[in-house]
C-alpha cells in the first residue's frame, strides 16, 4: 500500500506545509477584502483573518432599520465568502508541487 512512498520526504513536506500555513496566516492580516451592498449604501472591509476592520453605512439607511439589517447581512456574508475563497486558493497553491510518492 505504501510502496514507492518516501515517508521521510512526506514528513519533511508536512513540516514545510505547517510553516507555510503559519506564514500565510500572518500575511492574511495584511490583505483586505471589501464587499458592498445596496449599490454601495453599505461597505464592509475585513482582513484575510476575518476581522472586520472598517464599515461605512450611508446616512439614508439610518432611518430604515430593516433595510440596514438586510444589507449589512448581505455585505458581511459577501466579505466572508471572499475571505474563504482566498483561503481555499492559498491552500490549493500550497499543495501545488508537493508529491509524497516520489519524483
Curated annotation (Swiss-Prot):
One GO cellular component term, please give it: bacterial nucleoid
**Pfam families, A to Z:** YbaB_DNA_bd
* Keyword set, alphabetical order: Cytoplasm, DNA-binding
* Keyword DNA-binding annotated: yes
Q: Please state where this protein is localized.
A: Cytoplasm, Nucleoid
A molecular function annotated in GO for this UniProt entry is:
DNA binding
PANTHER family, A to Z: NUCLEOID-ASSOCIATED PROTEIN YBAB
Question: Which HAMAP family has this protein been placed in?
Answer: DNA_YbaB_EbfC
Which family is this protein grouped under?
Answer: Belongs to the YbaB/EbfC family.
What's this protein's name?
Nucleoid-associated protein SUN_2278
Task: List the lineage, top down.
Answer: Bacteria, Pseudomonadati, Campylobacterota, Epsilonproteobacteria, Campylobacterales
